[in-house]
From Swiss-Prot:
Gene symbol of the encoding locus: rpl5
Cellular component GO terms held in the UniProt record: ribonucleoprotein complex; ribosome
HAMAP family cross-referenced by the UniProt entry: Ribosomal_uL5_A (MF_01333_A)
Record organism: Methanosphaera stadtmanae (strain ATCC 43021 / DSM 3091 / JCM 11832 / MCB-3)
Name listed for the protein in its UniProt record: Large ribosomal subunit protein uL5
Record keywords, A-Z: Ribonucleoprotein, Ribosomal protein, RNA-binding, rRNA-binding, tRNA-binding
Family: Belongs to the universal ribosomal protein uL5 family.
Complex and partners: Part of the 50S ribosomal subunit; contacts the 5S rRNA and probably tRNA. Forms a bridge to the 30S subunit in the 70S ribosome.
Its biological purpose: This is one of the proteins that bind and probably mediate the attachment of the 5S RNA into the large ribosomal subunit, where it forms part of the central protuberance. In the 70S ribosome it contacts protein S13 of the 30S subunit (bridge B1b), connecting the 2 subunits; this bridge is implicated in subunit movement. May contact the P site tRNA; the 5S rRNA and some of its associated proteins might help stabilize positioning of ribosome-bound tRNAs.
GO MF, one example: structural constituent of ribosome
Biological processes, Gene Ontology terms: translation
Record Pfam families: Ribosomal_L5 (PF00281), Ribosomal_L5_C (PF00673)
Cystine bridges: none
């Protein structure tokens, strides 16, 4: 295979949506920090929704973006908590994959801490091919050619080869 056609993991994003600020959100931040050794960033609501009791610009979640070796390590940890199984519907047409884990204690090596409680989390993995910079650069950005876009099948194959994932 051509070196420029091999997909790779650009980033992995872990998100814990709490739905409210305060003590519960700080516990979720503490969990992410102990899980990946990196400080999370808070995300804020964009609109007011009185049914959920959320006001605009209120902190409701926290997330962390991982790249390189850290991303590979955390993806393999979380996938082993899911018994290395992913549905084909969890891949989008750009080749990215998103999956959730119901309870963080399902991840091997993570123990229950009564101070933190139990949280679920969403994991999103973004795939790219070399040459993606032409789309994101500041000067003279160009459209990404079709050959440099990651397809659903390519990312499925990557996950099977590198993480021993069975796709249902």
């Amino acid at each position: 295979m051509n070196v420029m056609q091999k997909p790779f993991i650009a980033k992995a994003t872990i998100n814990i949506g709490v739905g409210e600020g305060g003590e519960k959100l700080t516990r979720a931040e503490k969990l992410i920090e102990t899980l990946v050794d990196q400080k999370p960033v808070r995300t804020y609501s964009k609109v007011t929704n009185p049914e959920f009791g959320i006001r605009k610009k209120q902190p409701i979640a926290c997330k962390v973006t991982l790249r390189g070796e850290k991303a590979d390590k955390i993806i393999s940890m979380v996938l082993s908590g899911l018994e290395n199984r992913i549905k084909a519907s969890q891949f989008d047409k750009e080749g990215n994959v998103s999956f959730g884990i119901r309870e963080h204690i399902d991840i091997p090596g993570v123990k229950y801490d009564p101070d933190i409680g139990i949280f679920g989390m969403d994991v999103s993995v973004t795939f790219q091919k070399p040459g993606h910079r032409i789309k994101e650069r500041r000067l003279r950005p160009k459209k990404l050619p079709q050959a440099q876009r990651v397809t659903k099948e390519e990312s499925m194959e990557y996950m099977k080869e590198n993480f021993n994932v069975t796709i249902e």
